[in-house]
Every structure is written in structure tokens, then in C-alpha cells.
From Swiss-Prot:
Biased composition range(s): Basic and acidic residues: 934-943, 951-962
InterPro entries, alphabetized: ARM-like (IPR011989), ARM-type_fold (IPR016024), Vesicle_P115 (IPR024095), Vesicle_Uso1_P115_head (IPR006953)
Sequence similarity: Belongs to the VDP/USO1/EDE1 family.
Location in the cell: Cytoplasm, Cytoskeleton; Cytoplasmic vesicle membrane; Endoplasmic reticulum membrane; Golgi apparatus membrane
ARM repeats: 51-92, 105-144, 148-188, 191-234, 237-285, 287-313, 343-366, 367-405, 407-446, 484-513, 514-555, 648-688, 770-810, 830-873, 958-997
Name used for this protein in its record: Intracellular protein transport protein uso1
Coiled-coil intervals: 623-1034
Main location: cytoplasm
Any Pfam family hit: Uso1_p115_head
Organism: Schizosaccharomyces pombe (strain 972 / ATCC 24843)
Gene: uso1
Length: 1067
């Protein structure tokens, strides 16, 4: 009954809860150590079930067994599939932004052991579908965890990339797609892997894949393939050349051809694929590289321009990004390539459309229904089309000017609306800005085109040209400046202000004629300064910065014959704006992130100017300010005519005073010749100073190099010092230990020597006993001989017993006596034998003691040999240290040579400086003579003033101009002299620095020499101690060997044998 009750309780009791960590550890142990395949498979399935919830436990306990199963169970696809899937579960992380620690650890376990990567590479080419798929996905997971490490690891295998490329040609789509994703991530930012992939026929594989998928209509797979192609071509010149040489450009252009599309519907997948193909073509022809010229020519020869033009002007793509990227791709194709540019202009596309190039571009550029970014892509293409092609730029500019001058009503007449003051802001707010950018692209860096644009007639009725010949015409620059001033107060047209300023900066840069044209109306300059001074909250930093740049160029390129002189421009700027404020405007423009300033942000910004600028286009007393400006120009003309009449009246007085002027001219010519000579000398001195500066720069570099070498030497010496000190300490400790061992050995040797003495005394006693034994043995032998003779005689007498009885009796009596004597002898012999046995036991004891002494001597010899080895090692260390000290000495000598060379150069510089100072003194003397001559000229001018009152003003002007020229020349000479003085002072400071550096180097050298001498002395003392120790050891060994030989000789004399091994040791 008890049995049934217990079994009933067992059935009804709840089951025990099994812990996960125990189960996982058991399963992992079974997977790792089980011999049966079914056990390992069951364990792998159990581990897989726990892997999702307990990643850390499974990775900690079972990763070794999982990786072992990958190697061991390669032939079984089911178990291999389970293990690969388990690895995938462990490496994948829930958060896509950051890899988990478990995934990183597993990735490290695979990467650190190359056999694991090799196993994965083999499993990629497995027969089973899931094994191939999971292997590729596992590679992708490892790449997401450790990208750089996996790339470096794969490059160590020669056939890794070829193995990875095999699934890309697989007929099963999941495997192929997974491998495509993995490869596209693998080749990013790794040029070497990109080259290896291309050498495995990646281009042919990709194009065949695209063809099978239906080109740009292939969906996501085609998009990924095109992205992969773009990555292979971008920033990789060797792949670009291989792509061109293998004739793949027609295949890429075929993908972009509209005729190959399935239908006319443009869904998002097709648009994305076309855009990615255009990006790939852009990567093939990058801007700014000389290697892209061949690729540009190849695209042109394969009718790529017509294909791209068709996409860029396709009516269905007007509101897609495809059109914008097509114009940018065309810009890549024609940039700085005359052949491509001419082929674009001569394209049959424009003949079919019955239009010219510029009109077609302007149709899209000024189309307000499309976005500004689309329109700017056309402007960017126009810039690339005219880059480094002056002929085409001049042709386009002439077409625009011809349309304006002939008042043509077409797209080319963009200047008319651009300069019209009635419409200060265009309707879509971008036309004037685009016009400014186009004109800037066409005239930049070419003075002829700038003159052509600035010389067009403005604000004139073409029918009344003859009536207006006597009036001054308003120039192009003045009109653009006026339009800019009038536009500043319109908040919705500030992007046009940026365009106007950009064009003005391009016209003024490097062109004094344009600056003269701008300064012909001084009121415009004042209005610009008022805009620059604006400190209100609505002021725009970009516009103020560009105005500051423009005024800087105006001042820099201001010519001598300008209506407003250069000094007046400077005074006007400095009086209106402080220097710090002006620099602040420039710095604010420089700090602006211009890429973030979009058209919309420019539209929302506001700017205000003062009352004069606000009232510029208002009417005052029924008169327009522009008409008042024209009347002011007429008055200026009348004043110029009056000046001409006064000049004719003054010609007579000029002739009378021509003689005096000739004299003055001669004196001025002489002064000019002297100044020219001084300038030539100054140029020579300047060249010499430049050479000296270059030499000083070289010396500074050498000084820096020597300082760095000195620092390295100091560090090395410090390391050597520390090493020597530690080694010396160790040597002293070892020496003390050896001395202690020597003392112990000496004590032991004294004990052994005393024992040897006792042995010698006992051996002498044994010798005497042996001698007595030998004498007794000789006597015994003699007695035995006598006995033998007697026995012979007895035998003879026995034969004659009968006859000699008497003799027998006597013989018997003698025999008894002899027997008595023999008994006594036998007792003596037994006693002697006992004594010999005692002596032999003593000899054995002595021999055992000798063997012990031999063992002690051998241990001492071993210690001596070890000490000798240590001494030899210390000698080798000392030799190495001596070699290092020699090298340090050599480095110090080299540094000393460099310092001597620097001192020589410093001396040469001082000599040149002294010569320059002498030349400066001579130049100051000549300057003083010139000042005296100027004083004489002034006195002559004063005398001429009293001659005539009518001609006084003219003479004053002439003399003042000459005086100004001479004074300017003197000022320039003084400036040059001051500059030379400053350079001389700099040279002196550099020489002082060189001298200080040489002193520092000398002190460092002295300290190094001291340390070297100290180390050498210490080494010598150590060598002496080592020699003394060697001699002492040799003496001890010789004494031990001599005593050992004596002991052996004593043993031989005692009659004991010496082994052959001992004799060989003696030899």
C-alpha cells in the first residue's frame, strides 16, 4: 500500500521548474561533446529555441560548440542550417542604430580566427539553398558589427572575393539579392575591395542582372544593382578606366534611353532607378579630374548627349528630379571639354526642335512653373558649357546683346527686363537673379567680354541717337548700381540684390575701366556706404558683406585717371565706416554658411537703407530724379567745354614758359634716373633679403630638427642611464652574493684541507704497515721454499728407511721442532691478516670521504662555471653599452658639426646685414640730396610765381604735380627702406636665436660628455673588479686541482686503483 501511495503522490505532484541556464549549459555541452549525430542535432535545435530570448547565455555557453559544429558538420545540411540560423539570431540586434555587445563579441570570435571565416566562405558555395542564404546573411551581420575588421580579414584570403561573387550569379533570387546587399555594403569606403570585385567581372554580372530584371523597370533589385554600380565607380579612377575600356558605357546609356522603356508611365521605382543610373554616369565623369576627359569623349562618341538631352527636356519629367539631375549630368559630361561642348552645340536635337542652344536653355531657365533648383541646374549646365571656352562664351554674350540692342521680343532679350527700373522685383522673384548669374558666368575673367557688356547703350531711344550724341550716356554699371540701390528696400527681392552685387564684383575685379565707370557718379558710392553703415535689426549680413567686398575691389583697382582718386575713395570709406566695422562685415560674410542660404530664406530677410536711398526714385517738384541726373550730366558737359576754352587761352602763356619747364624737366629727369637706380638697388637688396630669409627658414628647420634630435638623444640617454643604474644595482647584488658564496667555499675548503691532512697522516701509517707486511710475506716465502726442500729430502730418505733409521729419528726430532716453529708463524700471519682487514676498512672509509670531497668540488666547479657565464654575460652587456656610448658620441659630433655650420651661416648673415646697413646709409645720403634738390625746385617755383599772375595757377599745377611725383617716389623709397630695416632687425633677432640655440646645444653636449665619462669610469671599475674576481677564481681552481692530484697519487701509492674517468678528467 505504501508503494501505491508514493506513486500516487508522485503523479499528482507539480513538475519541477527547470532553470534556463542549466538547460542551456547541458545542451551546449551535448552539442560540443556528443558523438552521435542525432544528439548534436537535438542539442542544436534546443539552443536555437533558447537563442532569441537568452542571447547572452547561449553566446557565453554555446558559441564554442556552435562554431565547432560549423567545422565538423559541414557535410550535413540540416545541422549546418540550424547552426547558421542560431548564429544569425545571436548577431542580429533589435535596435538598428547600434550593434549589441553579444553581436560584437560573436563577430570578433569569427574575425579573430581565420579558420571560421574560411568555413563561412566554403559554406557560401554549399549545395543547400538555406546554407548559402544564411551564410551570406551571417556575413552581412558580421559586417554591420565590425565593418573595417571584416574588410581587412577578407583581403588576407586570395579567393575570398571570388567566393563571395559566386552567389551574385545564382539563379535563386533570395541568395542573389542577399549577396547583392552584402556586396554593396562591403565595397563602401574601401577602394582595394572595389578593385578586386571589378576584376571578378562585376560589371558584366550587374548588367546581366539588370537585363534580366528589365532595366530601370526592375524595381528594388535594379535600384540596388545601380547603387552598387555607383559605389564601384565613384572616386575610383582605375575602375572608371576599366569600365570605359571594357565598353560598358553603351550599356549604361541604353538603360537611360527613353526608347527602351516599357511604357510611358513614370512611377517612383522607375524614377529612382533612372536617377541612380544618372548618378553612376556622374561618377564616371567627375568634374575637375584630367582622367575624366577620356570618359567624356567616350560618352559623347556613344551619343550620350542626345540621350541626356531627351531626358532633360522630356515633357512628362517636368516636375520630377530626373530632369534636374539630367542637366547636372550633362554639365559633368561637357565640363572643360571643347569636343564635348562643340558636339552639344552641334547636336541634331536642336535642329529637330527648330531652335538654337541658348534659346532652349533659356526656355527652361526662365520657366516659372518649375522649382528654382530645377532652373539652377540649367544655369549650372550653362556654366560648365562655357568653362574654358572663350569662343562659346563670346558667342552667347553677343547673342544676348544683339537681342537687346535690336529689341527682339524673344527669350534672348533678358537685359531689357533686367535693367528696367519700373519693375524692381520680378513676378517670380528669380528672373533677375538668374540673369545676374548668367551674365557673371559669361564675363568672368575676360576683359574683352566685360568691355562688350559695359559698352552697350542704355536708357536711349534708338531712333534719337543723333540728338543724344552730345549728352553723356548712362553706362551699364551705373544702371545696375542704380537698380541695386532701388531694390534694397524691397524685402521680396533681396535675392536680386545678391545677383546684382555678384555681377558688379565680377565686372570690377581686375578691370580698372569698370572701376572708373562706377566712380564717374560719386553719389552711388555714398549710397553704398550708407547701406554698409546700417546697424538696424533688419540689416542683412550677406548684402553688407558683399558691399564691403565690392568697395574693397573698387579701392584696390582704382586707376590714376579716375574721377574720384584712390585717396578720396579711401577717405570716403574710412569717414563713413570705421575700420573694425568694415572688417566685421567681411568676417560675418566669411562665417556665413552660404549653402544654407536658400532662395526662400533670402526672400524672408529684410533690409533697410537711409532716407536718401528711399527717396531715390521719387519725384521732387514734378521732376524725376533720373531727369535731374541727366541735367546734371549736361551741366558737367558745359563746364568741360568752358575748361577747354580756357586751355586754349592758356596755351600762349605755356609756350613762353616752356623753356623754364624744360629746365625743370631735365632736373626732374635726373632725379628720376637717380630714383630708378635706387629702386634697382632696392630690388637687388630685396632679392638678397629674400634669399637670406629662405636661408634663415632653412636654418630654423635645421634647428628644429636638431632640437628634436637632441630631445630624442636626451630621452635615449635617460633610458640608458636608468638601464645602467638598474644593471649596476643588479651586478652589485650579484657580486655580493658571489662574495658570500666564495666565503662559504673558502670555509668548506678549509674543512676539506684539514680532513685531507688527517687522511695523509693515516695514509703514512698504512704505508708503514704495508712495508712490515711485505717483509713478513717475503720471510714466509723463504720458509715455504725450505719446507719444499725438506719434503724432497724426506721422500729420498723414506726410500732408504731401512738403511737410514737413525737418520729418520733425528729427522723426526727436527720435524717436531720445525712444526712448533710453523705453529708460531701461523699465529703471527693470522694476526697480520686481521690488521690488514682493519686497514682496508679504514681505506674504504677514507675513499668514501674522498668521493664526498669530489662531489663537493664538482658542485664548486659548477658554481664557478655559472659565475663565469654570468661574468661573460656582464662583459657582453658592458660591450653593448660601450657601443651605445660610441653611437651617442657620434650623434653628438654630428650635432656639433651642424651647429658649427649654423654659426658660419649666422656669420655670413651678419656680414650681409652690415653691407646692407652701409647701402642703407648711402641710400639715405642720396635721399638727402634729393630733398635738397626738391628745396631748390620749390625756391624756383616761388620765383616763378612772382613773374605773372595770369600763369600762376597753371605753373602751380605743373610744379605741384611734379612735386607730388617726386614726393611719392621718395615716400615709396622711404617705405622700402623702412621695410628693409625691419627685415634686418628680424634677421638680427634670428641670429640671436641661433646663437642661443648653439649655446644650449653646447651645454647639452657638455652634460652628455660628463655622463659618458662617468659611465666609462664606472665600466672600467667594473672591468677591474671582474678581472680580480677571475684571477681569484683561477687561483682557487688551481689549488683544488693540485690537491686533487696529490690525493690521487696518495691513493695510488696505497695500492688503490684510480678510474679511467678520473684520469680523463685530469687530462
Amino acid at each position: 500500500m505504501d508503494i501505491f501511495h508514493k506513486s500516487y503522490n508522485v503523479i499528482l505532484s507539480p513538475p519541477k521548474v527547470q532553470q534556463a541556464d542549466e538547460t542551456i549549459s547541458k545542451l551546449c555541452d551535448r552539442l560540443e561533446h556528443a558523438t552521435l549525430f542525432e544528439d548534436r542535432k537535438a542539442a542544436a535545435l534546443g539552443i536555437k529555441s533558447f537563442a532569441r530570448e537568452f542571447k547572452e547565455l547561449v553566446a557565453a555557453h554555446g558559441l564554442k560548440g556552435i562554431i565547432q559544429s560549423l567545422h565538423r558538420d559541414y557535410d550535413d545540411p540540416e545541422l549546418l542550417k540550424v547552426t547558421l540560423e542560431t548564429c544569425l539570431i545571436l548577431t542580429r540586434h533589435d535596435d538598428d542604430s547600434r550593434a549589441s555587445d553579444t553581436g560584437l563579441w560573436i563577430a570578433d570570435q569569427f574575425i579573430l580566427n581565420q579558420d571560421n571565416i574560411q568555413c563561412l566562405l566554403q559554406s557560401i558555395s554549399h549545395k543547400d539553398f538555406y546554407v548559402r542564404l544564411y551564410s551570406v546573411e551571417l556575413f552581412s551581420a558580421i559586417l554591420s558589427c565590425r565593418p573595417t575588421e571584416l574588410k581587412d580579414c577578407l583581403q588576407t584570403f586570395p579567393s575570398a572575393i571570388s567566393s563571395i561573387m559566386v552567389p551574385l550569379r545564382d539563379s535563386i533570387e533570395p541568395v542573389r539579392n542577399a549577396d547583392l546587399y552584402f556586396l554593396s555594403e562591403l565595397v563602401k569606403d574601401c577602394t582595394s575591395i572595389q578593385k578586386l570585385v571589378v576584376f571578378e567581372n562585376a560589371f558584366e554580372t550587374l548588367f546581366s542582372l539588370l537585363e534580366n530584371e528589365g532595366g530601370v523597370d526592375g524595381g528594388i533589385i535594379a535600384l540596388e544593382a545601380l547603387k552598387f554600380l555607383n559605389v564601384l565607380l565613384k572616386d575610383n579612377i582605375s575602375n572608371q578606366n576599366y569600365f570605359r575600356e571594357s565598353n560598358h558605357i553603351p550599356s549604361l546609356l541604353k538603360l537611360l534611353s527613353v526608347d527602351t522603356f516599357v511604357d510611358g508611365t513614370w512611377d517612383t521605382s522607375r524614377v529612382q532607378c533612372v536617377i541612380e543610373a544618372l548618378y553612376a554616369l556622374q561618377s564616371l565623369v567627375p568634374i575637375g579630374l584630367s582622367s575624366s576627359i577620356a570618359n567624356q569623349n567616350a560618352v559623347v562618341s556613344n551619343h550620350g548627349i542626345d540621350v541626356l538631352l531627351t531626358l532633360a527636356t522630356h515633357p512628362d519629367l517636368l516636375f520630377f528630379d530626373v530632369q534636374k539631375i539630367s542637366w547636372i549630368t550633362l554639365a559633368h559630361v561637357v565640363y572643360s571639354n571643347a569636343r564635348a561642348q562643340n558636339s552639344f552645340v552641334d547636336s541634331t536635337f536642336f535642329d529637330i526642335k527648330n531652335t538654337d542652344v541658348l534659346t532652349c536653355l533659356f526656355d527652361y531657365l526662365f520657366l516659372s512653373s518649375i522649382s528654382p533648383s530645377h532652373r539652377y541646374s540649367v544655369a549650372f549646365f550653362l556654366r560648365s558649357l562655357t568653362s574654358e571656352n572663350d569662343e562659346l562664351s563670346s558667342k552667347f554674350l553677343k547673342q544676348i546683346i544683339h537681342a537687346y540692342t535690336h529689341k527682339q521680343d524673344n527669350r534672348l532679350n533678358i537685359i531689357q527686363g533686367y535693367l528696367d527700373l519700373v519693375h524692381l522685383s520680378d513676378q517670380d522673384q528669380y528672373d533677375n537673379w538668374f540673369t545676374s548669374t548668367i551674365l557673371t558666368y559669361l564675363v568672368i575673367d575676360n576683359d574683352q567680354r566685360k568691355y562688350l557688356l559695359c559698352s552697350i547703350p542704355l536708357f536711349q531711344d534708338m531712333d534719337n541717337d543723333e540728338d543724344s550724341e552730345s549728352e553723356d550716356k548712362v553706362t551699364f554699371i551705373q544702371c545696375v548700381s542704380t537698380k541695386l540701390i532701388a531694390t534694397l528696400r524691397h524685402e521680396n527681392a533681396l535675392q536680386n540684390c545678391v545677383g546684382y552685387l555678384t555681377l558688379l564684383i565680377a565686372l570690377v575685379y581686375g578691370n580698372p575701366d569698370s572701376v572708373k565707370d562706377f566712380l564717374s557718379e560719386s553719389s552711388i558710392l555714398q549710397t553704398f556706404l550708407t547701406a554698409l553703415m546700417d546697424e538696424s535689426s533688419s540689416a542683412n549680413s550677406v548684402i553688407q558683406g558683399m558691399i564691403a567686398v565690392f568697395l574693397s575691389l573698387v579701392y584696390y583697382y582704382c586707376p590714376i585717371e579716375s574721377p574720384v582718386s584712390k585717396s578720396d575713395v579711401y577717405n570716403a570709406i574710412t569717414s563713413a565706416v570705421k575700420r573694425d566695422v568694415f572688417i566685421n562685415r567681411l568676417q560675418r560674410l566669411r562665417r556665413m554658411n552660404l549653402y544654407e542660404i536658400t532662395f526662400l530664406s533670402m526672400k524672408q530677410k529684410m533690409h533697410a537703407i537711409d532716407d536718401a536711398a528711399d527717396a531715390f526714385n521719387t519725384k521732387i517738384g514734378e521732376i524725376n530724379t533720373l531727369d535731374a541726373f541727366d541735367e546734371a550730366q549736361k551741366q558737367l558737359k558745359s563746364l568741360r567745354e568752358e575748361i577747354d576754352n580756357t586751355k586754349e587761352a592758356l596755351d600762349l602763356s605755356v609756350k613762353e614758359r616752356s623753356i623754364q619747364e624744360e629746365k625743370l624737366n631735365e632736373s626732374l629727369k635726373t632725379s628720376k634716373t637717380n630714383l630708378e637706380e635706387q629702386t634697382q638697388l632696392a630690388e637687388k637688396y630685396h632679392e638678397e633679403l629674400l634669399d637670406n630669409q629662405q636661408k634663415l627658414y632653412d636654418l630654423r628647420i635645421e634647428l628644429d630638427y636638431t632640437k628634436s634630435n637632441c630631445k630624442q638623444m636626451e630621452e635615449e640617454m635617460q633610458v640608458l642611464r636608468e638601464g645602467h643604474e638598474s644593471e649596476i644595482k643588479d651586478f652589485i647584488e650579484e657580486h655580493s652574493k658571489l662574495t658570500k658564496q666564495l666565503d662559504d667555499i673558502k670555509n668548506q675548503f678549509g674543512i676539506i684541507s684539514s680532513k685531507n691532512r688527517d687522511l695523509l697522516s693515516e695514509l703514512e701509517k698504512s704505508k708503514s704497515l704495508n712495508n712490515s707486511l711485505a717483509a713478513l710475506e717475503s720471510k714466509n716465502k723463504k720458509l715455504e721454499n725450505d719446507l719444499n726442500l725438506l719434503t724432497e729430502k724426506l721422500n729420498k730418505k723414506n726410500a732408504d728407511t731401512e738403511s737410514f733409521k737413525n737418520t729418520i729419528r733425528e729427522a723426526e726430532l727436527s720435524k717436531k721442532a720445525l712444526n712448533d716453529n710453523l705453529g708460531n708463524k701461523e699465529n703471527i700471519i693470522s694476526d697480520l691478516k686481521n690488521k690488514l682487514s682493519e686497514e682496508s676498512t679504514r681505506l674504504q672509509e677514507l675513499q668514501s670521504q674522498l668521493n664526498q670531497d669530489k662531489n663537493q668540488i664538482e658542485t664548486l666547479n659548477e658554481r664557478i662555471s655559472a659565475a663565469a657565464d654570468e661574468l661573460s654575460s656582464m662583459e657582453s652587456i658592458n660591450k653593448n653599452q660601450a657601443n651605445e656610448l660610441k653611437l651617442a658620441k657620434q650623434k653628438c659630433s654630428n650635432l656639433q658639426e651642424k651647429i658649427n655650420f649654423g654659426n658660419k651661416l649666422a656669420k655670413e648673415h651678419t656680414e650681409k646685414i652690415s653691407s646692407l646697413e652701409k647701402d642703407l646709409e648711402a641710400a639715405t645720403k642720396t635721399a638727402s640730396t634729393l630733398s635738397k634738390e626738391l628745396k631748390t625746385v620749390k625756391s624756383e617755383n616761388d620765383s616763378l610765381k612772382s613773374v605773372s599772375n595770369d600763369d600762376q595757377n597753371k605753373e602751380k599745377s605743373v610744379n605741384n604735380e611734379k612735386f607730388k611725383e617726386v614726393s611719392q617716389a621718395l615716400a615709396e623709397a622711404n617705405e622700402k627702406l623702412n621695410a628693409r630695416d625691419e627685415e634686418i632687425e628680424r634677421l638680427k633677432v634670428d641670429i640671436i636665436g641661433l646663437q642661443n640655440a648653439s649655446l644650449n646645444m653646447q651645454s647639452l653636449k657638455d652634460s652628455d660628455n660628463r655622463t659618458i665619462s662617468d659611465l666609462e669610469s664606472k665600466n672600467k671599475e667594473l672591468e677591474k673588479k671582474l678581472k680580480e674576481a677571475d684571477e681569484y677564481w683561477l687561483l682557487i681552481v688551481e689549488e683544488l686541482e693540485s690537491k686533487r692530484t696529490k690525493d690521487k697519487e696518495l691513493l695510488r701509492q696505497c695500492g688503490q686503483a684510480v678510474s679511467e674517468d678520473e684520469q680523463s678528467e685530469e687530462e
